[in-house]
Amino acid sequence: MLKKSIGIFYRCFYLNNKCDYYLIFLAPFSLFTQIFMVITALISVANSGQMSLIWFTNFDTFTYQSNSLAIFLVWYYFLNHKSRWFENSSLVLSVTGYLVFTVIFFNFYALSRFTGIVNIEPDVQGWFSTITTQLPYSFNGSFINDWNAFSELLLHVIHPLFYFIYVGLLFKTYKFIKPPRNLQSFLLKAGIYPSIYAFYLQTIPFLNVWDNGENSYSVYGFFTQTKYNSYVWIWSIPIFASMFLILWMLFVINNHYYGKKHHK
């Protein structure tokens, strides 16, 4: 019985190399991040009295979903590294692309706020959106403000950075993980989730969620308000296309790196 228990423990932790040792740190930290997101959503509910805010403004954001996918991937690999999903790098590249997109666009938004290029007025903030007048990453001593600031830092800098280190170690350590060979097939499969999410962004303002006749719920306020803002399509299409550009770049980098490793 003892030998069997030790065997199960060993299969779960596979302490064979740097990547496996790093997972001993990353797996619990990722779990902490997921719990932190749940607590943040519950705080939103407590402050507003709106139970629906567990989903709206929290788990319906690309930030929460891309981080959650990365957390799921880490734990799935941690517990089942021999799964057929890891026979090639398609899944890892896809999730990495989603998180890269999150990091780039939120930090671009943060930079635009700090430089004054974007100023958040009530009409930009929207109605129950994730856009607030609070500057990103700004701590001021208020519990709610500081909690939100740390949440932004955790989900847009700290956790993504630790995840990217894991991906780097994974590809450096396990040379047998083959890259996807067909770009069109890879983009088609990897693009399913962001396409569904984009459809959600475009349709939620029309579903009469907190609709007062002049504004309605939009995940990112003015920037995704398709019902009351006719200009939203100007930036929506290129932003959506940039997701596929990121996935294409990861595909090219991965194939080039894999080729170099196997022709030494």
UniProtKB/Swiss-Prot annotation:
UniProt GO cellular component terms: plasma membrane
Gene deletion effect: Probably essential, it was not disrupted in a global transposon mutagenesis study.
Pfam hit, one: DUF1600
Main location group: membrane
Residue spans crossing the bilayer: 23-43, 59-79, 91-111, 150-170, 190-210, 233-253
Keywords: Cell membrane, Membrane, Transmembrane, Transmembrane helix
Subcellular location per the Swiss-Prot or TrEMBL entry: Cell membrane
Stored InterPro entries: DUF1600 (IPR011631)
Name by which UniProt lists this protein: Uncharacterized protein MG133
Source species of the chain: Mycoplasma genitalium (strain ATCC 33530 / DSM 19775 / NCTC 10195 / G37)
